[in-house]
Amino acid sequence: MAMSTNRIGGAIDKGVGAAKEAVGKATGNARLQVEGAAQKAKGDLQNKVGKAQDKARRRDQALNARL
């Protein structure tokens, strides 16, 4: 079963956000740190939405299999 595009996009945003945050910390760039933290949070939320979509899809498939 394929993962939802929200899960994939969320994982990408979390990774990019973590990298931005780390570079911001290493260079003392507070703006980049904040942008990275925000992008990580956005990615985490998007990933959770994707997980919920996948769970709903699996339930629908299970119900349809019983019919």
From Swiss-Prot:
Stored InterPro entries? CsbD, YjbJ_sf
- Gene3D superfamilies (alphabetical): YjbJ (1.10.1470.10)
Which stretches does UniProt call biased (Basic and acidic residues)? 41-61
Residues of the region (Disordered) are 37-67
Coiled-coil-forming residues are none
Q: Which Pfam families match?
A: CsbD (PF05532)
Query: What is the residue range of the signal peptide feature?
Result: none
What family is reported? Belongs to the UPF0337 (CsbD) family.
This protein is called: UPF0337 protein CC_0938
Where does this protein come from, organism-wise? Answer: Caulobacter vibrioides (strain ATCC 19089 / CIP 103742 / CB 15)
